[in-house]
């Protein structure tokens, strides 16, 4: 099946700013995240699709490549999946074109430097409480680390890499093709200008070994789904002593049984019985700091929103704290006893006639509207 356009997946325009993309991704992630048990059978696939689109469109280089070449820009190397994956991605077009034109006209790169290590990505799931308050977590990641025997050189201890006898250290060789003299990377040393005659017994000349390492990652308070934390130099080790890549920790906040987050505000629904809704009263509501009392005024209707200032989330970038917004839901009583039913019947009888109209103004307005609608039809 053909892939959908990433902008279409997130429902944003092609000139959307990063904050719009992040907001759109968060909305879809909350809707289709596996923890939310969506009724949509394709929820998991839609979640993965949105996540892939988000990762491409929030990376400036990858977005530029996608805008120019579409999905073809990434066909030669995926985004990496699961909890952990390579931070790379698509083909590097600058390298492709540089090699082609450089080789033909003799202006290609000379001796190739050892490659910097690949970036890595780790997907970290957090509870809402952890995201709001901040947390330090230990993670274990598989990676390519510098060989501790040869210290990344690839050569056996006591020996060193030697100058390549084919290119004499230039890293390139010339080949004549018709009227052209073409330069290309030396096939013997692969453009490095040096070869290893006596390779290290542990890494077999690669300078790197597969290894798992444990890191302690400090997550700042206020992070949200889609935020990314960069750990410089904690990616794969570079080739033959080149700098290491970086590790990117991608944050995903799990669904919460009580609260929903939007920006720095928290939302929750508070059920109350119809007697309290009519007469007023006081209830306890949950916050992330504990229970607080909320005064319910008389004649409160379903949908009434109460704002508790400063009970939301503190921004990860500093500044004021968000609010907690409690939406009241008036609950219809169930499992009534005979006495309760009788009391309700008596209450219902008191609503009959003109006296009851002022007790239910919305019902009267609705019935008046229905009557007018049918009167207009019969004219």
From Swiss-Prot:
Keywords for this protein: Chaperone, Cytoplasm, DNA replication, Metal-binding, Repeat, Stress response, Zinc, Zinc-finger
CXXCXGXG motif repeat placement: 147-154, 164-171, 186-193, 200-207
Locations listed in the record: Cytoplasm
Cofactor: binding details: Binds 2 Zn(2+) ions per monomer.
GO biological process terms, semicolon-separated: chaperone cofactor-dependent protein refolding; DNA replication; protein refolding; response to heat
Domain of life of the native organism: Bacteria
Cofactor: Zn(2+)
Sequence positions that bind Zn(2+) 1: 147, 150, 200, 203
Molecular function via GO: ATP binding; heat shock protein binding; unfolded protein binding; zinc ion binding
InterPro entries linked: DnaJ, DnaJ_C, DnaJ_domain, DnaJ_domain_CS, HSP40/DnaJ_pept-bd, HSP_DnaJ_Cys-rich_dom, HSP_DnaJ_Cys-rich_dom_sf, J_dom_sf
Residues annotated to bind Zn(2+) 2: 164, 167, 186, 189
One GO CC term on file: cytoplasm
Annotated J domain residues: 5-70
Record has Metal-binding as a keyword: yes
Zinc finger (CR-type): 134-212
Domain remark text: The J domain is necessary and sufficient to stimulate DnaK ATPase activity. Zinc center 1 plays an important role in the autonomous, DnaK-independent chaperone activity of DnaJ. Zinc center 2 is essential for interaction with DnaK and for DnaJ activity.
Similarity comment: family membership: Belongs to the DnaJ family.
Function description: Participates actively in the response to hyperosmotic and heat shock by preventing the aggregation of stress-denatured proteins and by disaggregating proteins, also in an autonomous, DnaK-independent fashion. Unfolded proteins bind initially to DnaJ; upon interaction with the DnaJ-bound protein, DnaK hydrolyzes its bound ATP, resulting in the formation of a stable complex. GrpE releases ADP from DnaK; ATP binding to DnaK triggers the release of the substrate protein, thus completing the reaction cycle.
Quaternary structure note: Homodimer.
Protein name as annotated: Chaperone protein DnaJ
Source organism phylogeny: Bacteria, Pseudomonadati, Pseudomonadota, Gammaproteobacteria, Enterobacterales
């Amino acid at each position: 099946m053909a892939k959908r356009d990433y902008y279409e997946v997130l429902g944003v325009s092609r000139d959307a700013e990063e904050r719009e993309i992040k907001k759109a991704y968060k909305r879809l992630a909350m809707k289709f995240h596996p923890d939310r048990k969506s009724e949509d059978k394709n929820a998991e696939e839609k979640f993965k699709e949105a996540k892939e689109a988000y990762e491409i469109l929030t990376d400036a280089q990858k977005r530029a490549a996608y805008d120019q070449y579409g999905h073809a820009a990434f066909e030669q190397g995926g985004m990496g999946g699961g909890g952990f994956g390579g931070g790379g991605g698509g083909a590097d077009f600058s390298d492709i074109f540089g090699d082609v034109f450089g080789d033909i006209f003799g202006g290609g790169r000379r001796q190739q430097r050892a490659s910097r290590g690949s970036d890595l990505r780790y997907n970290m799931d957090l509870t809402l409480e952890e995201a709001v308050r901040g947390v330090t977590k230990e993670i274990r990641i598989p990676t390519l680390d510098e060989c501790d025997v040869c210290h990344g050189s690839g050569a056996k201890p006591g020996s060193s890499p030697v100058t390549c006898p084919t290119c004499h250290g230039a890293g390139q060789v010339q080949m004549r093709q018709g009227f052209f003299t073409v330069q290309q990377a030396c096939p013997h040393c692969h453009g490095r200008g040096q070869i290893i005659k006596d390779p290290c017994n542990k890494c077999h000349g690669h300078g790197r070994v597969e290894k798992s390492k444990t890191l302690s990652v400090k997550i700042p308070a206020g992070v949200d789904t889609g935020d990314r934390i960069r750990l410089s130099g904690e990616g794969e080790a570079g080739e033959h002593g080149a700098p290491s890549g970086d590790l990117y920790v991608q944050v995903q906040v799990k669904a919460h049984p009580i609260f929903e987050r939007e920006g720095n505000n928290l939302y929750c629904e508070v059920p109350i019985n119809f007697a309290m809704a009519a007469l007023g009263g006081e209830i306890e509501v949950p916050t992330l700091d504990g229970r607080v009392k909320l005064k319910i005024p008389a004649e409160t209707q379903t949908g009434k929103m109460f704002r508790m200032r400063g009970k939301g989330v503190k921004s990860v970038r500093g500044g004021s704290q968000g609010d907690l917004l409690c939406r009241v839901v008036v609950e219809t009583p169930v499992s009534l006893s005979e006495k309760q039913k009788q009391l309700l019947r008596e209450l219902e009888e008191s609503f009959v006639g003109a006296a009851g109209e002022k007790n239910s103004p919305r019902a009267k307005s609705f019935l008046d509207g229905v009557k007018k609608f049918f009167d207009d039809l019969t004219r």
